[in-house]
């Protein structure tokens, strides 16, 4: 489903290199210190940044040099990037057609996704008229209408209060299960990571320092947990 082989990218003085294999339907939490390369990893997969060397395979096809629009991925950021002058329906519709000229099938897809994220009553409203949680639901819906098999999340819920963050995690679990999505989520919240993903990557200085069970890392039973500021039981 997703394979990175010696994928290399230079950021200022830091040379980042990623080797990674992910099966279809896996959920991966991406952890690590600020500036370690977590967002860069997602941007390389999405095509927003270009690797100097190495290869990137998505869904069995080589996407090392393809444009973001050609890649089978959708990406959601911490900032929802909704257009303030467009209604929620129009914002979500942009995921289907940049000119908002939707055919009947696309309109049906939009309605199905909107129902799944419980935003039926919000469609005619502007983003400013919604709560923070509703805006993130709308941003997630815009990703989902594209119906891509790989979902990339870059700290999407960090600005939400605990109740809203929990609400979004419940929704995310449901969506990933129903659609069998492959998920990679950057997070600084260890509880969120353990809840949403069985497998975790710990990124340090542009390299994968740990690739294993999330619960093992969060429990502090491996020495790599010290990088996250945790006391470890490892000798």
UniProtKB/Swiss-Prot annotation:
The record's family statement is:
Belongs to the ABC transporter superfamily. Thiamine importer (TC 3.A.1.19.1) family.
Protein name per the record: Thiamine import ATP-binding protein ThiQ
Answer yes or no on keyword Hydrolase. Answer: no
Function, please?
A: Part of the ABC transporter complex ThiBPQ involved in thiamine import. Responsible for energy coupling to the transport system.
Main location as per UniProt: membrane
**Description of how the protein assembles with itself and partners:** The complex is composed of two ATP-binding proteins (ThiQ), two transmembrane proteins (ThiP) and a solute-binding protein (ThiB).
Report the EC number(s), separated by commas if there are several: 7.6.2.15
Specify the superkingdom: Bacteria
> What membrane topology is annotated for this entry?
Peripheral membrane protein
Q: Known Pfam families for this protein? A: ABC_tran (PF00005)
The answer to keyword Protein biosynthesis applying to this record is no
Report which reactions are catalysed by this protein: thiamine(out) + ATP + H2O = thiamine(in) + ADP + phosphate + H(+)
Task: List each copy of the ABC transporter domain by range.
Answer: 2-230
In this chain, ATP is annotated as bound at: 32-39
Query: Whose protein is this, by species?
Result: Photorhabdus laumondii subsp. laumondii (strain DSM 15139 / CIP 105565 / TT01)
Query: What InterPro entries has UniProt attached to this entry?
Result: AAA+_ATPase (IPR003593), ABC_SmlMolc_Importer (IPR050093), ABC_transporter-like_ATP-bd (IPR003439), ABC_transporter-like_CS (IPR017871), P-loop_NTPase (IPR027417), Thiamine_ABC_ThiQ (IPR005968)
Keywords in alphabetical order, please.
Answer: ATP-binding, Cell inner membrane, Cell membrane, Membrane, Nucleotide-binding, Translocase, Transport
Give the top-level enzyme category.
translocase
- What is the annotated localization of this protein? Cell inner membrane
One GO MF term on file is: ATP binding
Its GO CC terms are: plasma membrane
Enumerate the SMART domains for this protein.
AAA
């Amino acid at each position: 489903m997703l394979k990175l082989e010696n994928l290399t990218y230079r950021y200022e003085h830091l040379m980042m290199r990623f080797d990674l294999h992910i099966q279809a339907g896996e959920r991966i939490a991406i952890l690590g210190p600020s500036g370690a390369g977590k967002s860069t990893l997602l941007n390389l997969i999405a095509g927003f940044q270009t690797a100097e060397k190495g290869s990137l395979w998505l869904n069995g096809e080589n996407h090392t040099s393809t444009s973001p629009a050609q890649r089978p991925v959708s990406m959601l950021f911490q900032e929802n990037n909704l257009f303030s002058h467009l209604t929620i329906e129009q914002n979500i519709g942009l995921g289907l057609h940049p000119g908002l000229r939707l055919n009947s099938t696309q309109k049906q897809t939009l309605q199905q996704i909107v129902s799944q994220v419980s935003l039926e009553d919000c469609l005619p409203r502007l983003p400013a008229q919604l709560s923070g949680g509703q805006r993130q639901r709308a941003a997630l819906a815009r990703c989902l209408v594209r119906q891509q098999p790989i979902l990339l999340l870059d700290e999407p819920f960090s600005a939400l209060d605990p109740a809203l963050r929990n609400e979004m995690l419940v929704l995310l679990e449901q969506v990933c299960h129903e659609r069998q999505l492959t998920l990679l989520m950057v997070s600084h919240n260890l509880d969120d990571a353990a809840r949403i993903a069985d497998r975790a990557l710990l990124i340090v200085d542009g390299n994968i320092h740990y690739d294993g069970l999330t619960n093992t890392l969060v429990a502090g039973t491996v020495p790599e947990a010290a990088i996250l500021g945790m006391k470890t039981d490892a000798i």
